[in-house]
Regions:
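C-terminal catalytic lobe of FAD-dependent flavoproteins
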Residues: 290-382
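Helix-loop-beta segment of a Rossmann-like dinucleotide-binding subdomain
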Residues: 77-90, 105, 114-155, 179, ...
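Helical element adjacent to the flavin cofactor pocket in flavoenzyme catalytic cores
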Residues: 137-184, 188-191
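Glycine-rich FAD pyrophosphate-binding loop
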Residues: 22-41
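N-terminal Rossmann-like FAD-binding beta1-loop-alpha1 element of flavoenzymes
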Residues: 2-28
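Short beta-strand to alpha-helix junction loop
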Residues: 57, 89-99, 137-153, 292-297, ...
Length: 382
């Protein structure tokens, strides 16, 4: 029997398993498919400073862990040694200007260096951008990493029993205490159960009378190959809030929408890669069915990217992909003990990579009964 069974092979589950094993516990990680097969392997892989102050300690713990892991990773993964730069830009629209200022100032409040740019300075810095931009905010922020390599390395770096292709059907509990999980291949017994299954977490907890306020929101990326580099740093059209988390997803309430598919929330985030390719992101939409409901989204992402940076319109399309993000109404994850022998780590939205390492640290302390590495109060069940 294991000390702990962790359900979920995304970045959150793998970070939890890594930390628990580091503490000397006998850990079994159960994943229904492959490690990083979902949103954990289908994202920008960006370390961007969160806007919300309560997330900063969790973020900093994550960065420290990834830096240590990258030096001796069992699956080598890329990690920028320092910030590549993050430029937020806006046109003349008043709402866009306000959003850009607020986002930049929120990040700068955490100590990130900020420079305000006028129209001419934007053109000198990024000449490929559209000429209707009137204000910009350049942040000394943004480190890129390989999210798949990170996730797999977290699971394999320690002595973790990884069981792939095993679907968890229920939490095994008796006498008011969880003591394992029921899978397609039988029962996995453990003294503690950690549920880190993203938006699949609520159905596992519901039979125990525990409601997790988490819904799935689909996010898309488009992968392009421009003939020449388009931008030299991360560029976001103001109003998308790539840094801030999923606050806008509070409107993605299952009770309000039922089975109706809401309109997608689409912005523009350009990410230049070391290999010369370009990742385009900036879309969120409430998930209703397992497969994408709206094939127009990646097309619209590419169209808006070409408006922000016209040379993008000539780039070769290498592909597009999507992942499902588990989101909460306030943009903060739930990382807490929710019952005897039962811990939840889910609801990280688009910030799984940003907060994953810190989440693992907190879960390790919770399971061990040790003092937490930072204030856990903002991450309780609410």
């Amino acid at each position: 029997m294991a000390d702990v069974v962790v359900v979920g092979g995304g970045v959150i589950g793998c970070a939890c398993a890594h930390e628990l094993a580091r503490r000397g516990m006998d850990v079994t990680l159960v994943e229904r498919g492959e490690l990083a097969a979902g949103a954990s392997g289908r994202n920008h892989g960006l370390l961007l400073t969160p806007q919300e102050p309560v997330l900063l300690d969790m973020f900093r713990e994550s960065v420290a862990l990834y830096e240590d892991l990258a030096a001796e990773a069992p699956v080598p993964f890329s990690l920028d040694p320092g910030p590549v730069g993050f430029l937020i830009v806006a046109g003349e629209d008043a709402a866009e200007l306000t959003a850009g200022r607020e986002e930049a100032e929120a990040v700068a409040a955490s100590g990130v260096e900020l420079a305000r740019l006028g129209a001419e300075e934007i053109r000198l810095l990024e000449p490929a951008l559209a000429d209707d931009l009137v204000e910009g905010w350049l942040l000394e922020d943004g480190r890129r990493l390989d999210p798949t390599g990170l996730t797999v390395s977290l699971a394999l770096a320690g002595d973790v029993d990884v069981r792939r292709g095993l679907t968890v059907r229920a939490i095994r509990a008796s006498g008011g205490r969880a003591h394992g999980v029921v899978t397609d291949a039988g029962v996995v017994e453990a003294d503690e159960v950690v549920i880190a299954a993203g938006h699949w977490s609520p159905p596992l907890l519901r039979p125990l009378g525990i409601e997790l306020p988490i819904v799935g929101a689909r996010g898309w990326l488009v992968h392009l190959a421009p003939e020449m580099p388009v931008v030299g740093r991360l560029v976001e059209r103001a109003g998308w809030h790539a840094v801030g988390g999923d606050e806008s997803l509070s409107r993605y309430d299952a009770a309000s929408f039922g089975s109706r598919v809401p309109e997608p929330d689409i912005g523009t985030l350009l990410q230049p890669n070391a290999d010369g390719t370009l990742l385009v992101g900036g879309a969120r939409q409430r998930m209703v069915t397992p497969e994408p409901e709206d094939p127009r989204v990646p097309v619209e992402l590419a169209r808006r990217a070409a408006i922000l940076a016209p040379p993008v319109g000539e780039a070769q399309v290498l592909g597009s992909w999507w992942g499902i993000r588990p989101v909460t109404g306030d943009g903060r994850p739930i990382v807490a003990r929710v019952g005897d022998g039962l811990v939840v780590a889910a609801g990280h939205g688009s910030q799984g990579v940003v907060l994953g390492g810190g989440t693992g640290r907190l879960v390790g302390a919770i399971v061990a009964g040790d003092p937490p590495p930072f204030d856990p109060a903002p991450f309780g069940l609410r």
